[in-house]
From Swiss-Prot:
Cofactor info, note text: Binds 1 heme b (iron(II)-protoporphyrin IX) group per subunit.
Residues annotated for Ca(2+) binding in this entry: D169, T221, W223, D225, S227
Site (Transition state stabilizer): R270
Reaction(s) catalysed by this chain's protein: hexadecanoate + O2 = (2R)-2-hydroperoxyhexadecanoate; dodecanoate + O2 = (2R)-2-hydroperoxydodecanoate
Protein name per Swiss-Prot or TrEMBL: Alpha-dioxygenase PIOX
Entries under InterPro entries matching the protein: A_dioxygenase, Haem_peroxidase_animal, Haem_peroxidase_sf, Haem_peroxidase_sf_animal, Oxylipin_biosynth_metab
Binding site for heme b: H173, H393, R490, R494
Keyword rRNA-binding assigned: no
Keyword Lipid biosynthesis belongs to the record: yes
Transmembrane segments: none
Alphabetized PROSITE patterns for the sequence: PEROXIDASE_3 (PS50292)
């Protein structure tokens, strides 16, 4: 009976699809519900005009909400088998476990160390195309830095350090014991720092699942649980804890402690550099300050309880800073300012939520504080495509501009330049030594006043093409690697779709010619030289760097769509941001700490009280510090129209 009503509607939609929708999406739309097909038609129509980011803020948010809904329905793919039924009681684990287990009561292992990377797009077998075109040719001709291009005043080196700090919290692939060797073809060998290099394959693991038969394990915990500070297992956690008053280890001078081999004692130290170490130090100080505040509020709390509550609070502070401070600077538009704040506070805003609590659904009050977590029927993980779009090494400069913080501030609170320190002196074990000489305060101010690199073609740091990689414990390996070439190879090896199929999978209109990707004539010429006329062969990393950017965005729109989906998922799927975001779990003082922290500046102010007053002129600690602060806009944000 119901089919009498629905069949004519489906026929009508089918005709609309054939006439109005890009042919590449006909099959995808045919598998959608009637409502979702209609929603896709709206999004696709706007995409064809390329105007969503120019819409008034409220309508831009509506577009993004519809697009996110579609991705939640069709771009969350489970890898591996899923247990059935309730597996654990949340009240037995009112804290973040060392290895990420027991967050999801229906799936003990979801988000744990060693769990599978998920997928946003079905894997595309590239075993026969691992060297087509050769990764070292791709890098030499299209990615390697010619001259340093920065982001102007929008994003600084703290911001570049922050995202690596987050990667060390979220993702790292398990390696196999088998090695692969790449050799530079003769046409580019003279321009490659390494003529050949060896590295370990990504370990391929059977999933026991009929659809996606093999997957890759994440050796970090993908929850937003601060594992960059605490580690992803009990062994590392025990090394960083003092087991006194809930605190973590740190020197009297405010530095991380070090092992005899020179490696830092911290949650995750693999392939690190002084910028990440500086942030790890800052958040060890934050954790310990939370412990002091909690103990002052309740002197009966024991070491274990203090640690557990302080970890919850510190992890939430990190997540909040990333959501409403870092990302807002990355995507510097009114629409994304409103959108990211809505993720945390909802459309009703901070003042309403602070006064009345979480009211209604996530649209009105945000994901944080929802009555129950939401994984959209797919166990929580971070995905292969997520790892791909976070390949952001062009953000790194060639040297750090060290500043004199003993001098008087210059114009816009700028400190004088002392010298430039090459990045090779700031990475790995040498970087730990250099940071001890510089000090955290001078390092923070110096990074704050220096613009980071732009995510564009010909801006991948040359010094990363001859890099000493680390073992998981932070010790150095003997074989150097060309990181740029390795990143191109890794996406192919892990069966991540190439750029055009990547876009199709995300319901984004694919390119049909190089001119659709970029207006840069030199780039078009070299793209043709490397890939010929076949746009389907374009590597996703190259496409993300080449793509025309939305005004205000430091990343490509393609990467942003993954952000749109996964940034929400990191909050809404985690019970410690939803059903357990309460005084009972965090304590009254702990919840107050999270709710009153709005930015990285707030954290810096707690541990370096004079620093921002003396040296920070900008509105955010993630934009260049001597920039003028944002001007107050009297127009309510939802009624603003982008310039």
């Amino acid at each position: 009976m119901w089919s009498i009503v629905t069949d004519p509607i489906k026929d009508l939609i089918s005709k609309v699809v054939k006439n109005s929708i890009h042919p590449d999406f006909h099959d995808a739309v045919s598998k959608m519900t009637i409502i979702d097909a209609f929603l896709f038609f709206i999004v696709h129509s706007i995409d064809k005009l390329g105007i969503w980011h120019r819409l008034p803020v409220f309508f831009g948010l509506l577009y993004l909400a519809i697009r996110r809904h579609l991705h939640q329905e069709y771009n969350l793919l489970n890898v591996g088998t899923t247990p059935v039924g309730i597996r654990s009681n949340p009240s037995d684990f009112p804290y973040r476990t060392a290895d990420g287990r027991y967050n999801d009561p229906f799936n003990d292992g979801a988000g744990s160390q060693g769990s599978f990377f998920g997928r946003n797009i079905l894997p595309v077998d590239q075993k026969n195309k691992l060297l087509k075109p050769d990764p070292m040719v791709v890098v030499t001709k299209l990615l390697e830095r010619k001259t340093y291009k920065d982001t102007g005043t929008q994003f600084n080196v703290i911001a570049a350090s922050w995202i690596q700090f987050m990667i060390h919290d979220w993702i790292d692939h398990m390696e196999d014991t088998k090695q692969v060797e790449l050799s530079a073809p003769s046409e580019v060998a003279s321009q490659c720092p390494l003529k050949s290099f060896k590295f370990f394959k990504t370990k391929e693991i059977p999933t026991g699942f009929y659809d996606i038969k093999t997957g890759h394990a994440n050796v970090r915990t993908p929850w937003w649980d601060g594992s960059v500070v605490y580690g992803s297992n009990e062994q590392v956690l025990n090394k960083v804890r003092t087991f006194k008053d809930g605190k973590l280890k740190i020197s009297k001078e405010g530095h991380l402690l070090h092992n005899e081999d020179g490696t830092a004692i911290s949650g995750d130290i693999r392939n690190s550099w002084a910028g990440v170490t500086t942030l790890q130090t800052l958040f060890v100080q934050e954790h310990n300050a939370v412990c002091d505040a909690l103990k002052k509020e309740n002197s009966d709390l024991e070491d274990e309880d203090l640690y557990r509550h302080a970890r919850l609070v510190t992890s939430a502070v990190i997540a909040k800073i990333h959501t409403i401070d870092w990302t807002v600077e990355l995507l510097k538009t009114d629409t994304l300012l409103a959108g990211m704040r809505a993720n945390w506070y909802g459309l009703l805003g901070k003042q309403f939520k602070d006064r009345f609590g979480h009211v209604g659904n996530s649209i009105l009050s945000g994901f944080v504080g929802m009555k129950r977590s939401e994984n959209h029927g797919v166990p929580y993980s971070l995905t292969e495509e997520f790892a791909t779009v976070y390949r952001m090494h062009p953000l790194l400069p060639d040297s750090l501009h060290l500043r004199d913080i003993s001098a008087s501030p210059g114009p816009n609170k700028s400190p004088p330049l002392i010298k430039e320190i090459p990045m090779n002196d700031l990475i790995g074990l040498q970087g730990e030594k250099t940071l001890l000489e510089i000090g955290n305060a001078k390092k923070l101010v110096s990074m704050g006043h220096q613009a980071c690199g732009a995510l564009e073609l010909w801006n991948y740091p040359s010094w990363l093409r001859n890099l000493v990689p680390h073992n998981i414990d932070g010790t150095e390996r003997s074989d150097h690697v060309d990181l740029a070439a390795l990143e191109v190879y890794r996406d192919r090896e892990r069966n991540v779709a190439r750029y055009n199929q990547f876009r199709r999978g995300l319901l984004l209109i694919p390119i049909s010619k190089w001119e659709d990707l970029t207006d840069d004539e030199e780039a078009i010429k070299v793209l043709e030289e490397v890939y010929g006329d076949d746009v389907e062969e374009l590597d996703v990393l190259v496409g993300l760097m080449a793509e025309k950017k939305i005004k205000g965005f430091a990343i490509s729109e393609t990467a942003f769509v993954i952000f749109l989906l996964m940034a929400s998922r990191r909050l809404e799927a985690d019970r410690f941001f939803t059903s357990n975001f309460n005084e009972e779990t965090y304590t009254k003082k702990g919840l107050e700490w999270v709710n009153t922290t709005e930015s990285l500046k707030d954290v810096i102010d707690r541990h370096h009280p004079e620093m921002t007053h003396k040296w920070l002129n900008s509105s955010s600690a993630f934009s260049v510090w001597d920039t003028s602060p944002n001007k107050h806009n009297h127009i309510p944000i939802y009624f603003r129209v982008p310039n």
